[in-house]
């Protein structure tokens, strides 16, 4: 369970819905700390007081692996990382994949395919606008969740 002493962190690059809150696509919001790097948090009071650290959009933090190891193994914190394990080209995205062999557990959540709309689980993000860059912050105006057949049939 999440203790009362927790902090939520999101990357500074993510300004989609709010500058200082994390938000679901349905606009359910939670106050958070905003950082470019995670290690910059270590000297702050909020970090020292927190028992549980929740990292939103973990793929955007360049020091994710180092920070998580320090927090969990060095400082005995509980850490939850939320993020994408792959980009819209099905390539590793950030350092999330480096955490897999270190995790106590991994829960991979799936959406429903927004292309075939038949209840099939979606395991990929498909970019629906032009562009080749890996980092393009967006929501359903740029990406949709799709199943494997829809991803492969409509590249």
Predicted regions and their residues:
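Conserved catalytic/switch belt of AAA+ P-loop NTPases
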Residues: 69-76
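Conserved P-loop
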Residues: 1-44, 87-98, 108-111, 121-124, ...
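Short basic (Lys/Arg) and small-residue
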Residues: 103
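Proline-centered turn/helix-capping motifs that create local helix->coil transitions or kinks
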Residues: 114-118
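Short, high-confidence coil segments that cap the C-terminus of an alpha-helix
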Residues: 3-4, 50, 76
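Structural recognition of the conserved hydrophobic beta-strand(s) that form the central parallel beta-sheet
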Residues: 54, 76-85
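Conserved ATPase-coupling elements of RecA-like P-loop NTPase cores
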Residues: 57-68, 86-93
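Conserved P-loop NTPase "ATPase switch" module shared by AAA+ and STAND
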Residues: 47-61
């Amino acid at each position: 369970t999440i203790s009362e002493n927790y902090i939520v962190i999101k990357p500074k690059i993510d300004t989609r819905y709010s500058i200082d809150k994390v938000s679901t696509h349905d606009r359910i919001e939670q106050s958070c700390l905003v950082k470019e790097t995670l290690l910059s948090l270590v000297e702050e009071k909020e970090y020292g007081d927190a028992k549980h650290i929740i990292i939103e959009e973990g793929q955007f933090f360049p020091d994710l692996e180092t920070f998580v190891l320090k927090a969990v193994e060095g400082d005995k914190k509980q850490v939850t990382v939320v993020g994408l394990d792959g980009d819209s080209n099905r390539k590793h995205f950030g350092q999330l994949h480096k955490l897999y062999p270190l995790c106590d557990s991994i829960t991979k959540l799936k959406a429903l395919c927004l292309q075939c709309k038949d209840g099939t689980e979606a395991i990929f993000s498909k970019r629906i606008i032009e562009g080749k860059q890996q980092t393009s912050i967006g929501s359903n105006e740029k990406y949709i969740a799709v199943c494997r057949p829809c991803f492969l049939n409509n590249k």
